[in-house]
């Protein structure tokens, strides 16, 4: 056990970020609303931070932090990795909520374009061996879905 609960961690981080004391009632309501959006059981907020969560629960917990802390830049690395279809939809809905309401930037690193389907994509970059070899708009995602990554493996 970590003795730090998810709820406590998020509230403390939010207070550090804003420099203001967060009223418990306001925080609790926002946390409950956000957890409901992510289809998370309210009891998760009382669990130890990052202890005993399944893979899908960890991913949802990451998106919960994203939505509660509203960073100006978030890097999501393989957020869809290992998720079933329903969990991908839920995580995508959380990311979509961030795009609509948080006015921040996202860098989403993924091998699967499924998570991108419901999101607004401004730029798409293809990396091979740590180098960006092609940049485009959302249509590049469609191109990759149609033809795969094979052409990039030859580069």
What residue spans do the PLM features occupy?
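Short, small-residue-biased leader/transition segments that mark boundaries at the very start
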Residues: 1-5
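Q-loop/switch helix immediately C-terminal to the Walker
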Residues: 6-18, 30
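Hydrophobic anchor residue at the start of the ABC signature
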Residues: 62-63
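ABC ATPase C-loop
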Residues: 66-67
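Conserved catalytic motifs of ABC-family nucleotide-binding domains
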Residues: 70
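Walker B catalytic motif
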Residues: 78-79, 86
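Conserved catalytic loops of ABC-family nucleotide-binding domains
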Residues: 94-108, 116-118
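Conserved beta-strand-loop-alpha-helix hinge in the C-terminal portion
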Residues: 123, 127, 131-154
